[in-house]
């Protein structure tokens, strides 16, 4: 009897200790997301129950965009977020404790170039003024586009411009074109007579835009098994999106307060993936060299930088076929 009581007492002490230290048993993964189509799978994974089915207590918190959500990840108040290298590379170079665990959104149909009626070919941009958001994926696409089409960038006036000002500036003639992302691209020709989309970044394989799933490193270390299960849940979600696009769009649209038809339209050009491939890392290294060249961050050894940033172990543990690292 005394032995049985001792066993029960010991078990109770163990349970209290687990609760008191916030152990894995009561951990909930919190994803910071922007209110836009690239983040739709996180909403669907939670609301449709894919996270729960994989044994992952999870929630999402919405921000205006991925950038402020990422800042919360760096601060340690959220577990994970999703941004491009133009945000996470400078942060990591400045000491942010973050780990890249998977590529997530890939598209060649988000970044685009809009030009005025006077621009008939890429070379016509020489001697003209072009707007973009500097030090972002949009500016990187611009330089890759110029390189592809033999445009001498030294002959182009590049103006840093707020996205909300692009169409008005094009209308007034303050700029002759702009490179940007999202709805700013297709909407401009609707309000600026003669304007047109001259190219998207994926045309001629100029630049394929990527966003990756970034975890706070301390959270990853403390919840490695949960992180692996969450990757499986996201893979389940992506399969559902492909098989049931209407229902998927309705779920995401409700959270983002968008009509299902509009949500579906915005999700359509996006390729959601859970993978880590060496080819993608090599492309990331190329853009990292450009980021360093723009100034503001110093990365003496880019290969070492990326080997320390990427952690393929959670994906290897649950879906080894999704990574060749």
Q: What would you call each of these model-derived segments?
A:
Residues 1-9:
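Bacterial N-terminal signal peptides that target proteins for export
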Residues 9-17:
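Bacterial N-terminal signal peptides
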Residues 18-24:
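Sec/Tat signal peptide C-region and signal peptidase I cleavage site
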Residues 25-152, 157-162, 176-182, 197-201, ...:
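Short, glycine-/small- and polar/acidic-enriched structural segments
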Residues 40, 44, 48-49, 71-75, ...:
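Solvent-exposed, polar/charged alpha-helical surfaces in well-ordered, non-transmembrane soluble domains
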Residues 86-87, 159, 164-254:
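Pocket-lining segment of extracytoplasmic ligand-binding domains
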Residues 221-298:
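Secondary-structure end/capping motifs
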Residues 292-325:
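Conserved C-terminal helix/tail region of periplasmic/extracytoplasmic solute-binding proteins
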